[in-house]
Amino acid sequence: MPITLQFGMTFGGRGGSIADDAVRLENLGFDSIWAGEHIIWRHPMHDGLMTLAVASSVTKRVLLGTSILLMPLKHPILVAKAVVTLDHASNGRAILGVGVGGEYPKEFIAMGVKREERGPRTNEAMQIMKRLWTENNVTFKGRFWNLEDVSIEPKPVQKPCPPLFVGGRRGSIPRTALYGDGWIPYMYTPEMYRDGVKQIEEIAHKAGRDPSKIQRTLYAFTSVADSFEEAAGWSAAALGTNYAQDFTQLVKKYPIVGTPKQCAERMQQFVEAGVRHFILAPSGPADKTKGFAEIYAKEIIPTLRKWNA
């Protein structure tokens, strides 16, 4: 039976290249464009929603998602309002991907948020935003936020609301099952993904939710070269710098690296584990990663579509 797959890519550029990158990715045929964010990080990063706002002004078709927005560091009313604005600006193409963060404690210290509260804060925020998008006169009594008779207008273009995806690792599983419209794990193997899908289905069923309505996405760092060793080396160096740890062995386990054929074969393993939407994050030297989009568009994605037709 044919499998419908979607392919997205994260922004690889900085500064003035945002608009150019968005146009290029849409013209190459990608289904979605994604922007991550860190308020404070080891290298320069733009605000995710502002980046997507720029992209919305120069594209017409691609979905525009955050991968991910650090929800515990934001007020849910402000995020809900910003996402509605993006949804209108893009004529209904916005996706809000949220996560709890925590891998860079300086962000939480600077924002005055306790790291141990990041999960419960995100759970409350997700509930609040969905209600603000779909209801008027919202009253909510929580541990972190209290709303009394609050409405935001206009409502989103998408009905009932923009998809709310959950990023992360193990902690993202129950959050997705209970509150999410989609799952975006990262640093996962096919085996981990298959097990995660099973857990989401079980938790969603118990909560009275239909797990078939939860979109199955994967955020995957990727590096493409003439050999596995070269691609793995590029990715290990880049990820090691970003996450301040040794990725020499981890790069063989989590990212999608290798020749175009090897990348396609690894992605097919994820398809068989349940992935239906790939978010590809180029990982490697800046002068090499810019070409990854073309390689995916011309070689890897057509191969996967053929295998799953």
Predicted segment positions?
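An alpha-helical appendage that flanks or caps ligand/catalytic pockets
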Residues: 111, 115-156, 187-276, 286-291, ...
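Residue-level signal for nonpolar/aromatic packing positions in well-ordered secondary structure
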Residues: 7, 27-29, 86, 96, ...
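N-terminal beta1-alpha1-beta2 module of alpha/beta enzyme domains
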Residues: 1-58, 63-64, 159-162, 283-286
